[in-house]
Amino acid sequence: MKDFSGTLNFVMSLRRCFIACAVSISVAGCSSPSTESPPKSSVQSAKAGTATTAEQPTSSLLDAVVPNGYSSISTDDGRTRTYKVVDLSNGEDDVPMVLVVHGFGGSAEAMSAYTGIEAALAEAGVDAVVVYPNGSGADEGSPQSWNAGGCCPFAMYGPVDDVSFFTRLISTVEADYSTDPDQVWFVGHSNGGMMGYRLACEIADKVSAIGVAAGALMVDACAPSRPINVLHLHGELDAVVPLDGGDAIGIVFPPTRASVDRYADAAGCDPASAAATNSIDRTCGAARVSLVVDATWTHDWQPDWSRRFVDFFVTTSRA
């Protein structure tokens, strides 16, 4: 029998944070949960289409502590953002940049530890520069999140300009390392996957492929400047972002298939199949948009997800 304890703890953490933010409609309203979130499950939730005007964060909320081994950049909204780079280029030039993005309540360090993306790249023989960014929290120690449109607090209420952050982050890494601007790969879990969809909709010229793990498309408008490669992995046992969508912890998520088809339609892919199936494989010129569903997967990061994403990126980049 599957153990959902980690997922349930995340649900309760997000419920507390979401209610606090919604009641106060302010940055300070999203406080740290009393218990530490487990490292292997990452929850994101928000009501799609919610627009909230919040107070501007104080300077204490804008300043981030930069951990040892991390770099930082300043963003247009006045924040200091942190990220870690792992150089696996082995001295090669024009290697892929791989952005690996945590979900609600997660961190760059945890994402690095539990995804095994570096091992998957090594097994595939891919030299790369791997980047682990941190999201934003209301204050030091509060749950970190990404503003993926309709999700998640604190970032969505800040509001934090995460699109600008990723634009600047990609440019900074390209300037500091010998990466290929045509091979910028994004892997996101939960709220991180939602952020991937937002980037695919809004800065497709900066990102060539996204891997979405247990996420959803939560922006109101999606008008990509070009189609990019998308692989969405989702489990039938996901109790946080349900495969069939609907109300989860008071938040309405779109069905997973609807998220994938909506992006594919916006990107100008070939028509969706009318067959009643959870799998999707659509082409948009040279780009490919795919959904893979498994009956045994939960919301937690699954052991083979990193390998699946890397294999997909390698295959589609050579197409």
Per-segment meaning from a language model:
Residues F4-F18:
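Bacterial N-terminal signal peptides that target proteins for export
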Residues A20-A28:
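Bacterial N-terminal signal peptides
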Residues S74-K84, G91-W185, M195-R198, E202:
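Serine-hydrolase catalytic machinery in alpha/beta-hydrolase-like enzymes
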Residues G135, G211-V219, G235-D238:
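Active-site nucleophile loop of the alpha/beta-hydrolase fold
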Residues L231-L233, P254, R262-A319:
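C-terminal catalytic histidine-bearing segment of alpha/beta-hydrolase fold enzymes
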